[in-house]
Every structure is written in structure tokens, then in C-alpha cells.
């Protein structure tokens, strides 16, 4: 008797399982409800301009959160368009996952220079040569000061920023770029008490190669604080100005 009851219960469980399995199999993916989002923010370790909370807050604020909606009713293209309007986002990809979730991959804009001009302008130049607003967190890039207009920044200074990003030695060494009224460039290094005068923008490969040679064969021998100014303005030569020392007066 007990054996028959157990067999009956087993058959009932098998029947219930088959009913659930068939129902789930026949349910169209479009009718399934979105269970959540999988957010991926690229370069989040180096640049924390955008957070997952910020993305969620933006979607909820525009009533675009896909969670709880039918997968077939979710417009991933609309999500991409809305998120791409954020001034700190470079690219967005939205897609459906097999687990009934919406995947969102965000690429942040990458700043290469910060401009703090005499005219009051304060912004970043990104790696595409476009003006970028100041986010809540700061980026460790060279600061540009002086007589800087936006046209000069995105054309002339952008190429210098790209050069610095491509050369880790100079990216680490150059702390500030000052633009004079004559649109000539002065660099303030992190190491050393000198000013590096580049002159007019351009010829960065040649100028910095000269500076590297001077560092290795000159400053390493005489000391990093011997000169107050190192000029790379002219081809095939470097001119320097000595640091003026104040001598103690005799009693």
C-alpha cells in the first residue's frame, strides 16, 4: 500500500514538472519580464566619473528603467540614445541577455588635459579633442593655464596632450602648461626647479627628445636645480638660464 502511494506521488511530481517545463518552454522570450540590469562601466578604476548608481538614477529619473517590463517592450536603442546624451559618457551599448536581463556597457570619456584659463574657463579636453565638463572627481592630467581660448585648446593644446599621453615619462613629468600672450608654451615639471620653454606649439617629438638628452647628460651631472629656464625653442640647440642665488651679506 505504501509502495503504491509513493509511486502515485512520484507520478504526480513528474506530471507537475512536465507541465511547468512545457509552459516555460512555450513562453516566448518577448513575454518574459526583465529581472534586472547588468551594468559594466569601463575604465572605472582609472576614471570614476560615472557610477552604477548614477546610471540607475538617470534611468529612473527618465522612467526608462527596464526592470519589471516585458523584454519585448524594452527599446534598447532608446536606452543607448538617452545615456549617450550624458556629457561624461563617450559610448553606450545596450543588449538583452539570456537570463532575461538588460546588459549596459558604458565607456567614459577620457580627459587628457585640464584647462584653467585666465578668462575663467575651466574644462577638460578629452582624447577626441572635444571640450569636456568638469566631473565630480578630478583626473590626474596636466593643467593648462594662461591665455587660452577654446579654439587654441582643441587644436594646438590637444596635440600636445596626445603626445604626453603617448609618452609615460613626459606624462608623469609635466605638471603644468602655461600659455603666454604670444601663444608660446611654458612647461612646469614635477621634478626640478626650472621652466621648460617650448616656444610655439609643434615639433614635440624633436623638442622632447632634446630635453631627454639634456636631462640624461646635463642635469644628471650638474644637478636638477642649477638652471631656472631651459629653452627648446630653436632647432638643434638648447639655451639655458642659470638660477640666481642670493649670497649672504658680510657683516
Go through the PLM ranges and name each one.
Residues 44-85, 133-136, 140-162, 199, ...:
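Periplasmic/extracytosolic POTRA-like scaffold domains at the N-termini of outer-membrane
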Residues 19-39:
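Aromatic-capped interface at the extracytoplasmic side
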Residues 105-181:
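Extracytoplasmic segments of membrane-associated envelope/inner-membrane machinery
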Amino acid at each position: 500500500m505504501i509502495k503504491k502511494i509513493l509511486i502515485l506521488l512520484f507520478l504526480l511530481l513528474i506530471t507537475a514538472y512536465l507541465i511547468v517545463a512545457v509552459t516555460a518552454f512555450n513562453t516566448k522570450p518577448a513575454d518574459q519580464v526583465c529581472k534586472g540590469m547588468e551594468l559594466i562601466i569601463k575604465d572605472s578604476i582609472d576614471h570614476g566619473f560615472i557610477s552604477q548608481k548614477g546610471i540607475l538614477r538617470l534611468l529612473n529619473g527618465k522612467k526608462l528603467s527596464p526592470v519589471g517590463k516585458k523584454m519585448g517592450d524594452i527599446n534598447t536603442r532608446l536606452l543607448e540614445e538617452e545615456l549617450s546624451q550624458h556629457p561624461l559618457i563617450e559610448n553606450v551599448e545596450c543588449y538583452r541577455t539570456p537570463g532575461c536581463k538588460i546588459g549596459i556597457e558604458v565607456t567614459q570619456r577620457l580627459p587628457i588635459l585640464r584647462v584653467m584659463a585666465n578668462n575663467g574657463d575651466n574644462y577638460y579636453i578629452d582624447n577626441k579633442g572635444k571640450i569636456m565638463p568638469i566631473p565630480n572627481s578630478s583626473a590626474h592630467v596636466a593643467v593648462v593655464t594662461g591665455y587660452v581660448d577654446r579654439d587654441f585648446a582643441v587644436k594646438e593644446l590637444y596635440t600636445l596632450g596626445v603626445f604626453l599621453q603617448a609618452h609615460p615619462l613626459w606624462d608623469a613629468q609635466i605638471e603644468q602648461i602655461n600659455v603666454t600672450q604670444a601663444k608660446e608654451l611654458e612647461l612646469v615639471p614635477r621634478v626640478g626647479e626650472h621652466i621648460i620653454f617650448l616656444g610655439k606649439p609643434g615639433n614635440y617629438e624633436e623638442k622632447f627628445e632634446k630635453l631627454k638628452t639634456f636631462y640624461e647628460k646635463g642635469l644628471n651631472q650638474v644637478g636638477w636645480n642649477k638652471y631656472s629656464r631651459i629653452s627648446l625653442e630653436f632647432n638643434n640647440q638648447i639655451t639655458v638660464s642659470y638660477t640666481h642665488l642670493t649670497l649672504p651679506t658680510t657683516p
